[in-house]
UniProtKB/Swiss-Prot annotation:
Keywords from the named record: Carbohydrate metabolism, Cleavage on pair of basic residues, Disulfide bond, Glucose metabolism, Hormone, Secreted, Signal
Subcellular localization(s) per the UniProt record: Secreted
A GO term for molecular function: hormone activity
GO CC aspect terms: extracellular space
Oligomer status and interactors: Heterodimer of a B chain and an A chain linked by two disulfide bonds.
Propeptide part(s) removed at maturation, as residue ranges: 54-85
Function field: Insulin decreases blood glucose concentration. It increases cell permeability to monosaccharides, amino acids and fatty acids. It accelerates glycolysis, the pentose phosphate cycle, and glycogen synthesis in liver.
Any coiled-coil regions, as ranges: none
Family that this chain belongs to: Belongs to the insulin family.
Protein's GO biological process: glucose metabolic process
UniProt source species: Cyprinus carpio
Descriptive protein name: Insulin
Keyword Signal assigned: yes
Length: 108
């Protein structure tokens, strides 16, 4: 079964590289295409994937914030939050194009 997955990933990447003259160029990889690329890049060592979970409790019972509270909080912490937020593989390779070297960062 694993051989078929690797063969499928190889065929996919060959098809993508034949369309794109520069196969080493960063590409958008989403969903099954991203998983196939990780299988191909990481090989037998495999890769790790830790999907984000929604751990916030339901907040429907809390009153909504006023416009001033929201504006001040967003303005005060916007830059800091963007700096400390770690980019996941979806943000790095699906929302933006990534290279094979960036994919290797997710191998075990």
């Amino acid at each position: 079964m694993a051989v078929w997955i690797q063969a499928g990933a190889l065929l996919f990447l060959l098809a993508v590289s034949s369309v794109n003259a520069n196969a080493g160029a960063p590409q958008h990889l989403c969903g099954s295409h991203l998983v196939d690329a990780l299988y191909l890049v990481c090989g037998p060592t495999g890769f790790f994937y830790n999907p984000k979970r929604d751990v916030d409790p339901p907040l429907g019972f809390l009153p909504p914030k006023s416009a001033q509270e929201t504006e001040v909080a967003d303005f005060a912490f916007k830059d800091h939050a963007e700096v400390i937020r770690k980019r996941g593989i979806v943000e790095q390779c699906c929302h933006k194009p990534c290279s094979i070297f960036e994919l290797q960062n997710y191998c075990n």
